[in-house]
Each structure stands twice: as structure tokens, then as C-alpha cells.
């Protein structure tokens, strides 16, 4: 039970990190178009 929760938490953190890293790039692309 706790292992599943830990796995979901880890995936969620990875997704959030990805959004944080991709955010500026998306903003730049949006301004460029």
C-alpha cells in the first residue's frame, strides 16, 4: 500500500519538475509564434 503511494508521489514530483523545466520553454515558443 505504502509502496504504491511512494511510487505515485515520485511520478507526481517528476511530472511537476518537467512542467517547471518546460514552462519557460513553452512561454518562449508562445511569444515567438
Swiss-Prot record:
GO terms for biological process: antibacterial humoral response; defense response to fungus; defense response to Gram-positive bacterium; innate immune response; killing of cells of another organism. Signal peptide: none annotated. Keywords: Antibiotic, Antimicrobial, Fungicide, Hydroxylation, Immunity, Innate immunity, Secreted. Induction: By bacterial infection. One of its GO terms (cellular component) is extracellular region. It is found in: Secreted. The modification 5-hydroxylysine is found at residue 21. Hemolymph. PROSITE patterns: CECROPIN (PS00268). Belongs to the cecropin family. Monomer. Cecropins have lytic and antibacterial activity against several Gram-positive and Gram-negative bacteria. Also has activity against fungi. This is Cecropin-B. The lineage of its organism: Eukaryota, Metazoa, Ecdysozoa, Arthropoda, Hexapoda.
Amino acid at each position: 500500500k505504502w509502496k504504491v503511494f511512494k511510487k505515485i508521489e515520485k511520478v507526481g514530483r517528476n511530472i511537476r519538475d518537467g512542467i517547471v523545466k518546460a514552462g519557460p520553454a513553452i512561454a518562449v515558443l508562445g511569444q515567438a509564434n
